[in-house]
Structures are given as C-alpha cells and as structure tokens.
Amino acid sequence: MLLLKTEYTLWGVNMINFSNLIYLPVDVPNPPKGAVEFFDTIDYKDMIVDTYRTCHHIPIMDKDGTFSSEAKEVKGLVEWFENEIFTWSMPARMRIITTPPGGHNACHIDCSPDRIGTWQHKFRYVFQGDRTTLIFNNKEEDVRIHDVDKCYIMDGAWPHEMLNTTNKRKYTLTLGAPWEPQSDDKKYVEVLQRSYSKYKNYYISSEKWQLPENWKSLFQPEYDDQLYLLENYNGA
C-alpha cells in the first residue's frame, strides 16, 4: 500500500489524493441501452480469446482509436464515447470482457512491473451481470466492489479477478492502454473529484491494504524479464 496524504492542494484547490484508489463510480451518464441484445448474438468463436485472464473479448476500439464494426452496431454507443467519455479521457483499446455463465476470470494484474507505483486507473462499465463479483485480492481479506449501476474507475495494478454467478453472460466494458491518466491530468482529476463528491460513500481505497503473498506471480508471463524491478518493492 502507499501511505500518502488523503488531501493536497493543486491548481489552488483542495484535492483528494487518488493514488490509493481501488474503486470509484464515475459521474457520467451510463451508455445507451440495447447493447446486450446485440452482444448476445456474437458467438464465442468470433471473439478474441484471452488466455491470461481466461475470458473472451468483443472488440470495441483498436489502440489507434478506430471503432470496430461491433461498436457501430449498438445505436448511440459511438456518440456516447465521443460526447461523454473522450472529453476527459482519450481513444484507446476498448473491449467487452465476456465471462460465460459460471465462468471465472483468473486473478491478474493489468499492467507491467515497470508501471507499478504509477496510476493504473481503468474505466469500466458492467452492461450485464453481478457487479459485486469483481474481487480485489489482498493479504488480509478479499474485497468486492459495490452494486452501483454506474461506470467506474478501478485500479488495474492491484490483483483482481472476476466471477459470473448468473446463468447469462457477463459483459464488462473496458477502456485501457494507451490511456494512462496521471495526477497532473487536470480534466481527469476534475472528473474524479466530482465523482468522489457524489459517490464517496462507495469509494474503496487500498490505504490500509497489503498485497497478497503471491502478487509478483500474477503478471503476464511476457513481463517475467521485468520482475527484478520489484525485488525491493512490497507495496508499502
């Protein structure tokens, strides 16, 4: 965990320090309805297989900012991104994590070892499924997120896993690399501040957490050559 001041001053304003953010609902409109009906028509064989996270992905946008044909099939989805999300974030790789009924997305870390210690905030929205089955692993006890039907920001650098305990697919929108907002990103921090003011009762922080014993084994295998960077890092 990072023991940092809870508040600080930036741009002449008292700010909350989000370096320990694990989960925060975001004060933006939810995406348009109707996506689930279309996603249900897509066969698993036509999705991207993610062996590391043990799930399938429906592509929404490439890293270069090009919307997929699937994204364009959902009425209003492209416009929602352009009007509500990219005004404070940026076009980046977006996918729909698809977890089958009874499925389990393996515990993982959504960044490379050389990015540990930086903000690894990820944007998410659950179109269908039990929101509380996103689970963050720590040394003392695992913690589930709240059941709030809102987009949210989560910490991709903290070990986490996901279950689907329903009899339908779970669909989770993800926005990730190369978007990597930091504490000097004024537009992004303003969204966090506004969201915290509205949803602070649901905010989850890692301030008093400890990483699980096996956390260094949870990175993607392709990053094994970077693990030496963490030899003296214990999350404190």
Task: For each feature predicted by the language model, list its residue ranges.
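Catalytic core of non-heme Fe(II) oxygenases with the double-stranded beta-helix
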Residues: 82-153
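Catalytic core of Fe(II)/2-oxoglutarate
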Residues: 135-235
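Positively charged, low-complexity intrinsically disordered regions
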Residues: 54, 94-96, 109, 194-195, ...
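Non-heme Fe(II)/2-oxoglutarate
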Residues: 1-89
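A general secondary-structure signal for short beta-strands and their flanking turns/coil
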Residues: 21, 120, 168-170
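Residues that cap or initiate secondary-structure elements
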Residues: 30-32, 102-103, 113, 131, ...
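Structured loops at beta-to-helix junctions and adjacent beta-edge loops in soluble globular domains
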Residues: 27, 41, 99, 128, ...
